[in-house]
């Protein structure tokens, strides 16, 4: 496929992903192990960390470590995280390393053979990466299943609670939330309606679990999240007191653009409290059966 290399007897003055799958797997495993393969240390942990560290912070969206690109959905697909590193080759080859799930993906192919008009860009890379990302499970926060948005592009999925009458000044929504979306392009929105037609954003806070002290709640005044939750469940609370004395519906709306997606969004352990009363609990079978899902599915992983 490389006419210049052919004319020079096989010599090519450029770099790319050139080797067999096994050699690349050894390289990937070594880097994910922090520089160790088997019983041999090849690189120091400090050196490996530099490969996964963004040194291009002045240019958001163009994250780059030493030698590797970082967080690039255009070929990493749903494997992309702020710590995911990768490299591509001209003919559609790619190597993606995701330390957050301890997984790697090698794609070897020749999309310009026998003719360059066959070139398919990064679509095979993204499709394969999405499948691998989906194969890594996200376990429910509670119980056997959680609501999953799916990973479809150019779509809108809604998860709607039944209409609930709220009479307390301390009414609130509580749930567990997990998200991984293409930053800014895709998002998860919490919305409310008193008539089932005009929906407005519901501000909320999230708390990421951590060792030791309880972290401060992170406000989401626009009632939405995008990007990466750190591959952990967050506790969400939303103040619903503004709808006191009204019948209220709540819904989650997950939207994606036409190009790339992340691992998706999960919602679990949904509860609506009206003061001292729990007026909705997704763990109660009767309440669970009243949830309206379009595009969302109950998933064990």
Where are these predicted regions, by residue range?
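Short, Gly/Ser/Thr-enriched beta-strand-loop segments that form substrate-interacting elements
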Residues: 1-2, 55-98
